[in-house]
Amino acid sequence: MTVPGHRTDLPAELQRVHMVGIGGAGMSGIARILLDRGGLVSGSDAKESRGVIALRARGAEIRIGHDPSALDMLAGGPTAVVTTHAAIPKTNPELVEARRRGIPVLLRPAVLARLMAGHTTLMVTGTHGKTTTTSMLIVALQHSGFDPSFAVGGDLGEAGTNAHHGSGSSFVAEADESDGSLLEYRPDIVVVTNIEADHLDFFGSVEAYTEVFDRFAGRIDPGGALVVCVDDPGARALAERLSGSGLRVLRYGSTGTGALDATLLEWTQQGTGAVASIALRTEARPLTMRLSVPGRHMALNALGALLAAREAGADLESVLDGLAGFEGVRRRFELVGSANGVRVFDDYAHHPTEVRATLTALRAVVDQAGSGRAIVVFQPHLYSRTVTFASEFGAALSAADEVFVLDVYAAREQPLAGVSGATVADAVSAPVTYLPDFSAVAARVAASVAPGDVVVTMGAGDVTLLGREILAEVEARA
């Protein structure tokens, strides 16, 4: 284990860091990089998790539960306390104690910005698809001989991790727009996947939400580039607003959307993968792009990653090879397993657009098999999002053959009167069952499925735990 007095390449403020909520996807990635760069890390979280266990194995000191004494785990005490204000209340006893002691309290984005300093920075933002597109970009660069540092919101299939301190000069990361913290960064290359209304509980209006993307684009380094998916109306409008700004804008999308730098000409589902025909402005002839993940939206994400990788100097053939081998990201249409002819996938989709995209991919998988039904187990995420998008969720989920709706996963929110999973279930036109008792879900779903059916558990909460339970129940009923 690292000891006090050792050498690091970290700024003084980040050499001994205590992290409140260390097990989360974003926080655990920061902890990994700090440890890799020679820092000392302690932390706390509300419960054990894969992230907590992995960080302990790398030398982090971690407690379950929150107590002021947690700040004494590092010899000499922490030089900074890091948290994410979206999940941790200011009344947290460790944050209160840090302020009492005069220890700087930093938010995760500010720390990530410090870690990216001195690198060529490539970032992906947008309402949906950030984690997958960022991961595709990382893999494309790795297959081109780069060793980028990276921080991403999910575990890469190939790397098995959500963060890495690389030996190269580039750093790839997501830029989360949900709380405006992406304005901490000064990137060189930015990919914008899409822009549509979300996180209105924080921004208050669609206009304020949209504006943060304009402001972020204004922070791109002179000589850098903005890569935009013009299939999406919100992202296309951003590109149009910036057309006379002097910023170089690269556009990608489908045919019929104007002169593009990368065009998706054709796309064909092949099992749980796909093959696409694409055209690049720099190439005389169409090219074949193969993917190991399903869904037309994934092909568009891959085009954005391809353009960004090429901007960073990556070889085209190597990029295409990397994209062909991309295994996906944990909880992004991830195969959990199969039992008695029933396949179960898990997906993070928690916005109507994401639900539609995932169901399109699910439907293609079912149609390719030639039999079976598409079944969704959906858990609404946040009361505010549920009440805002109930009808849109209902319309999106109605593309399934059967839907099971769980109660709302509250996360950081307090309940809203009259809002529950039934609010969404009532808007679904397909056969639907509302299941407020989480413990009864696996058995109820297993009783409904038949060989050939494909089930996807969907949402940003603990619905992810149900996939294996459903498979176990299916096996038990054989």
From Swiss-Prot:
InterPro entries tied to this protein: Mur-like_cat_sf, Mur_ligase_C, Mur_ligase_C_dom_sf, Mur_ligase_cen, Mur_ligase_N, MurCDEF_pg_biosynth, UDP-N-AcMur_Ala_ligase_MurC
Subcellular location, record wording: Cytoplasm
Major localization listed first in the record, in broad terms: cytoplasm
EC number(s) recorded for this UniProt protein: 6.3.2.8
Gene3D superfamilies: Mur ligase, C-terminal domain (3.90.190.20), Mur-like, catalytic domain (3.40.1190.10), NAD(P)-binding Rossmann-like Domain (3.40.50.720)
SUPFAM superfamilies in UniProt: MurCD N-terminal domain, MurD-like peptide ligases, catalytic domain, MurD-like peptide ligases, peptide-binding domain
Record-level Gene Ontology MF annotations: ATP binding; UDP-N-acetylmuramate-L-alanine ligase activity
Record bears the keyword Oxidoreductase: no
GO cellular component: cytoplasm
Class of this enzyme: ligase
Pfam families in the cross-refs: Mur_ligase (PF01225), Mur_ligase_C (PF02875), Mur_ligase_M (PF08245)
Alphabetically ordered keywords of this record: ATP-binding, Cell cycle, Cell division, Cell shape, Cell wall biogenesis/degradation, Cytoplasm, Ligase, Nucleotide-binding, Peptidoglycan synthesis
Biological process (GO), any one: cell division
Catalysed reactions listed for this entry: UDP-N-acetyl-alpha-D-muramate + L-alanine + ATP = UDP-N-acetyl-alpha-D-muramoyl-L-alanine + ADP + phosphate + H(+)
Binding site for ATP: 126-132
Organism superkingdom: Bacteria
Pathway info: Cell wall biogenesis; peptidoglycan biosynthesis
NCBIfam families named among the record's database cross-references: murC
Family note: Belongs to the MurCDEF family.
Entry function: Cell wall formation.
Name used for this protein in its record: UDP-N-acetylmuramate--L-alanine ligase
Organism: Mycolicibacterium vanbaalenii (strain DSM 7251 / JCM 13017 / BCRC 16820 / KCTC 9966 / NRRL B-24157 / PYR-1) (Mycobacterium vanbaalenii)
